[in-house]
Amino acid sequence: MNKKVKIIGAGLAGCEAAYFLANNNIQVELYEVKTLIKNEVQKTNNFAELVCFNTFRSQSLLNAAGILKAEMRRLNSLVIKIADGCKIDGDDALAVDREDFSKKLTEVIKNHPNITIIEQNVSHIDDENDLTLIATGPLTTNELKEDIQRLIGKQKLFFIDASASIITKDSIDFNKVYYSGRHKLGKYICCPLNEQEFNEFADNLINAEQVQLKEFEKSIFFKGCQPIEQLAKTSKKLLLKGPMSPNNLLDQNNHQPYSVVQLRQDDAKDSLYNMVGFQTNLKWPEQKRVFQTIPGLEKAKIVRYGVMHKNYYINSPKILNFKLQVMRKKNVFFAGQITGVEGYIESASSGIWAAINILAFINNKKIKPLPNTTILGALTNYITNSKIYSLKPMKCNLAILEQENKYQSNDKFYSFNNSKNSLEEYIKQLNQILGTSI
């Protein structure tokens, strides 16, 4: 078989897949359209742009996000390697300078001798002749969406996603805010609100003017990324239990406020901060008006406003096998958020897994599914499980893991150790089958 792979989309999944295949002597043509067609959320021409957040979530090996990153490191993830090198203070999270991250990752991909970058709007998938990985993410172009529909049928789905505002540090009134962190591993800027201030702010959110959605879009928010105003409209208590929770955010007098708005460092220069959990669909003038009612942010300068966008994904259980391969078209694979995984690390890791299977396909080798004792294996099993009637976007979590003896174990790191051991054994077998050196 011709050892060349066409990858559509230079996002997190596409770049991970390209890097893995290229490192295994596969020629990769990586197609990217963002220099030709702009969209409402991406701001630069660099690959793998981080739109919603600047964090790859917790590094704790007691939770799924931390375990998945450990699995990715073991699989030689480019995304995690670059993220580790661009790390900024983020409490227990792996937070990065988002521009530095995308820039450095782009440099690695563009300078790889086995990767050719092609700036082109791909509108047709040659599913008969090309070995293709579709990793176009949530912002797939209309032309390609139509051709994907031709390929897989009318089984594509979507949800509404949103991003948060970013403000300049020098516009914050530090007489009214303080530094604190829930996990004592890092510091966030905390804007405290008393009960009256909180209620007034919540009312402002509820009554603020939003960008109008179409009728069929109004009830399909992804629950992990709901706009702050949507939470407020559902119940003010959701704000106190979620993004405005004051728990363990004590001020300099060891006092816990009624509620808190957290600001997280967004760049290596420590000049920009994003509003944690404040994804929004408010009109831009309304964002400025409402957010400037928060104590300490009265003169806040917003350098990037929150926006909302539609995320497309396919009905993977009906379309893909465990290899992330289209069941009816064996030379077409999918990876990333378009498969129904949700989140940066979930998308990136699916790119690695798709690339492993593409390498096996090229070499006519058969490999087994990843063990469901690993986060990546369990997540892949979830999105490709034919028993799922209606796929909803899924972040990694411990509930989907296969861990029969967890509750008989006294090891609080049971899930991590189980994942580590089973992945190590799997990689050993994989290297023997594929001749790789992972």
UniProtKB/Swiss-Prot annotation:
Keyword terms: Cytoplasm, FAD, Flavoprotein, Methyltransferase, NAD, NADP, Transferase, tRNA processing
SUPFAM superfamilies: FAD/NAD(P)-binding domain (SSF51905)
InterPro entries attached to this UniProt entry: FAD/NAD-bd_sf, MnmG-rel, MnmG_N, TrmFO
Gene Ontology biological process terms in this record: tRNA methylation; tRNA wobble uridine modification
Chief location category: cytoplasm
Cell compartment(s), UniProt: Cytoplasm
GO molecular function, one term: flavin adenine dinucleotide binding
GO cellular component, one term: cytosol
Pfam family, one: GIDA
KW NADP (keyword) present: yes
Catalytic activity: uridine(54) in tRNA + (6R)-5,10-methylene-5,6,7,8-tetrahydrofolate + NADH + H(+) = 5-methyluridine(54) in tRNA + (6S)-5,6,7,8-tetrahydrofolate + NAD(+); uridine(54) in tRNA + (6R)-5,10-methylene-5,6,7,8-tetrahydrofolate + NADPH + H(+) = 5-methyluridine(54) in tRNA + (6S)-5,6,7,8-tetrahydrofolate + NADP(+)
Listed EC numbers: 2.1.1.74
Residues bound to FAD: 9-14
Cofactors required: FAD
Keyword NAD tagged: yes
Record's function text: Catalyzes the folate-dependent formation of 5-methyl-uridine at position 54 (M-5-U54) in all tRNAs.
Protein family per UniProt: Belongs to the MnmG family. TrmFO subfamily.
Name under which the protein is recorded: Methylenetetrahydrofolate--tRNA-(uracil-5-)-methyltransferase TrmFO 2
